[in-house]
Amino acid sequence: MRIFSLLILLVVASALQSQVVVNENVKHSKYAFPLVASKIKATVCYDANDYPVVKKVAELFVSDIENVTGQKLKLADEWKKGRTVVIVGTIEKNQAIRQLASNGKIDISPLEGAWERYLIQTVNHPFPGVDKALIVAGSDRRGASYGLFSLSEMAGVSP
């Protein structure tokens, strides 16, 4: 089986805008986030207390990445220690996202009070034992879903 490398490269254009690039060649960058690489498989984490649709979309994302790369990501109902993690959830109910915001590692203020909006951002060393996290924070359950689906779409999955 041929192993593909899938890389999501986040380049922050400004405080409110970002550009996401999906690439099969892993390049080292401050904003690069390897989902699947030769020795790396990210864990997709959601909060068990978040809306049920967040769990469902996390499961679909894991399936989408497996369809594209042939590699299955791990899925967890809380953030886990590991080299790379994807944390998906709503700003209201995801404890990890709220903690990152309160520690000043992500700015969720543009999402507060908004409908169907999301933020995608990489964070280096967000928690002890985690090297890098890709945060997909939604203003509400639809926002979290749209954010993760947009990553699937960028990886080549048709909605």
Feature annotation, model-predicted:
Residues I3-A13:
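Sec-dependent N-terminal signal peptides
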Residues S18-P159:
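Contiguous, structured surface segment used for ligand recognition
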